[in-house]
Amino acid sequence: MKKALVFFVALAMIGSVFAAEPAAEAKVAEFSGNAAVTFGFDLDTVKAGFKNTTEADLKFNLMNGGDKSTTGNGVWGELKLVVNALQIRATADVSDGHTFAIQTKKDNDGEDTIFVEIDTAKLHFNDLYVGITSGDFRYGGSFWYPNALNYKDSKEDEKYTRSRAAKLGYDQGLVLGYEKKDLFKVELAARSKKDTTKKVEKVELVHLSAGAKIKEKEYYKTEPAAVTGDTAQDIFNDGTLVSVTADPKVKTLNAEGAYYKPVMKDDETNYWTNKFALGLYGEVTPIKDLRIGVGAAYVLGQLGAAASEDDKTNDISVFAGVDYRFNFNEDFFIQPTVTYNFYNDYKVASKNYAIETNKMNAGLRFGFAKSKSDSENESLLYTFFGQEKLFYETTKNDKGDQILLPGVSVFGSFNFKENAMKTELPVMLTFYSGELVQNLKAYALFGANLGPDAGKGTAVAMSDAVYKGIIEKKGMQAGLAASYDVKVNDAVTIVPAAGVLWTHGSQASGNDKMSADEVAVSLKADVKGLVSNTTFTAFWEKASFGKGAASVGGTKTSVDAVKKGVIGLKAKIAL
């Protein structure tokens, strides 16, 4: 019902707010489908069978995306409204059922519920301006590390994509700025914090496994306690149920069990809180393609009141970033990006500061200028091995490689907190061939935590569960995948493809040690054009060969983890 309402509102806005921009249209953008049959033989269970799949997709454009802005000179008000492309989409998938949705797409965020938004609102006084839209002090959002296989992959989990300044929660206010286009800009922001009360919407009974991470006020022993927030019934405070960790805000559950979790929702919002923060950001472009940005924020907290941890009183956030592109010639270039983040947390109880973040991240790409980036296809490494196995995939919300950048990329993260780099020193190297060699697509990955103490920890006897746990940590990984188009004649093309992914992990304490290795393999060959609109595929997938070994107290244990995988043939008709 809500989507239908937004749909009709958006249609009305086409005629009223955006008279000419963007243009309304009614046309079929995509009408496609496919049907496939696969015969597979599981080499582990020694069983065979058929699998039928059908997919259909209809995309009907109602309106192109666009924007409308006021214009002026000297003293004037700038307002820019942006509308996303509006599209009806209907899908049919035997595995997922049938769906019908009105959707929009903005930037690289995938589906977005915003149809019309204010992009810019500024009062201009020649080169001076006052911005009046909301926003936090998350400086550095436009400094992306140029990783070849996962550029802009996720805007939430930013471990290998970008590193913005800390979120302070002060997002209401204005920005006073001065800008000389293509030279520099400086902005002073004054913002306040709104307070929104929460209330329990419902209570869920959740089954937790042993070792689950628990936070305060997250799970309770009884349903009434979850509603009232009874601290005595909070399992976080029960030493018989949970164990402490290195992080005082997180504990682990000793044994599996079912507990009550309150699901909260926003209640009332108060904007007049007397809580303020200040920020300053500057950006300069001294030469073409070189950009330097520096920003800092300081939290004043509630004026006239005692310092508060909840309000982040006296906290300090700093960001600095540099990115550049240098063209060697028309074929090759380098593209470095370096960022630095610092966050100093003021502890009210001790009246001292504690450094929470002190980290520099750096990315460097050696790019192939004549090859275009690819935002339509995933890398073969992702296609073959999936999100859960790849070093750089760290969140379940990611949906594959967002954009593939032709070239070689190197990434490193350096945590300057005391002793942090002894256990945390991640580096990553990625490669995408682009169109460097005609008909060849190649992808490579190396990732590792090079901290000298990263492998230190308690060693236990090897078992299937221990082996799996070590591999899932992805301590070190190397992967390679490639495909090549072989044109038999004008009609028929054979595309062989192969991928291999090695994952290693280890842990040791004194003479006790354990380690695990896994090599995953996938092969396939597509035959296109033999029959019109049809692709025939022979494949071997989901195969892995692993071994885990441990030596604890002089006793050696080991496990073999071998999955022979599935071989099969597939025929797919598509239009």
UniProtKB/Swiss-Prot annotation:
It comes from the Bacteria. Major component of the outer membrane sheath. Residues 1-19 form the signal peptide. The gene is mspA. It is found in: Cell outer membrane. Transmembrane segments: none annotated. Its main location: membrane. The keyword Membrane applies. GO terms for cellular component: cell outer membrane. It is a peripheral membrane protein. Keywords: Cell outer membrane, Membrane, Signal. It comes from Treponema maltophilum. This is Major outer membrane protein MspA.
